[in-house]
């Protein structure tokens, strides 16, 4: 084990969010489906920060003095879009959760705050007829029919990103202040909305993307997508 990566610059994968999200329904917003780009952790779960600290103690502390280690990838290709569009899909996934799910409770509180705690203002924005914000928990969907609705869902995505990158980067640096945080390897440039990139850039030394181009040797071209 002492010879592992000795003399070679290397990185360490932590899989903080993906490991947390595979622990059961209360721990994910989008479930793991035994394929890439499927899971997204419930960053609003009260145990998420503690799990990140546990994972950092386990995986980062042993590397804090390694001169050959470049840094840590937090995760790989999380489903920042839930199962829908990049800006609204995560909020839509939360709306499908059970009324007691902590992410749905967080979304209720977030939307109530945006409406200034006014259910009348909320109903006017969303075209609903709720008598109180707790009734939101019984709904399984909210529309994305206009800019204001999409903006609200996009800002909830920003909140989720802030909770994710704050908890993970803080846990990593607590155990290893000597190496870089290399982002969460978004699935291509479309694998997360730019608001997520912005938040990642505030917490990571490097924001990383996985891109899968292919080369046509006959044409002498490299394509970034099949189209």
Regions found by a protein language model. Name each.
Residues 1, 31-54, 96, 111, ...:
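The substrate-binding groove and active-site-proximal loops of carbohydrate-active enzymes
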Residues 1-64, 164-175, 195-197, 201-202, ...:
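Aromatic-lined substrate-binding rim segments of carbohydrate-active enzymes
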Residues 5-9, 15-37, 64-142:
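Aromatic- and acidic-residue-enriched segments that line the glycan-binding/catalytic groove
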Residues 12-14, 74-76, 183-186, 211:
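A cross-domain feature marking catalytic cores of carbohydrate-active enzymes
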Residues 59, 72, 118, 172, ...:
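Conserved, mostly hydrophobic/aromatic
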Residues 60, 72-88, 210-227:
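Long hydrophobic alpha-helices with heptad-repeat/coiled-coil character
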Residues 151, 155-227:
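Glycoside hydrolase catalytic-domain groove-lining segments
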């Amino acid at each position: 084990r002492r010879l592992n990566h000795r003399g070679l610059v290397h990185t360490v994968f932590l899989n903080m969010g993906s490991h947390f999200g595979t622990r059961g329904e209360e721990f994910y917003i989008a479930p793991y489906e035994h394929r890439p780009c499927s899971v997204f952790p419930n960053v609003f779960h009260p145990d998420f920060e503690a799990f990140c600290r546990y994972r950092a103690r386990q995986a980062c502390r042993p590397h804090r003095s390694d001169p050959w280690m470049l840094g840590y990838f937090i995760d790989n290709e999380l489903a920042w879009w839930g199962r829908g569009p990049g800006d609204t899909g995560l909020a839509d996934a939360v709306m499908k959760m059970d009324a007691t799910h902590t992410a749905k409770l967080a979304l209720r509180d977030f939307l109530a705050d945006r409406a200034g705690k006014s259910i009348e203002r909320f109903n006017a924005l969303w075209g609903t007829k709720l008598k109180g914000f707790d009734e939101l928990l019984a709904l399984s969907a909210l529309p994305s029919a206009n800019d204001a609705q999409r903006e609200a869902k996009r800002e909830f995505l920003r909140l989720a990103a802030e909770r994710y990158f704050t908890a993970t980067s803080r846990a990593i640096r607590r155990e290893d202040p000597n190496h870089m945080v290399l982002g969460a390897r978004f699935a291509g440039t479309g694998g997360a909305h730019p608001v997520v990139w912005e938040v990642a850039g505030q917490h990571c030394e490097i924001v990383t993307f996985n891109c899968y181009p292919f080369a046509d040797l006959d044409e002498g071209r490299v394509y970034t997508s099949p189209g």
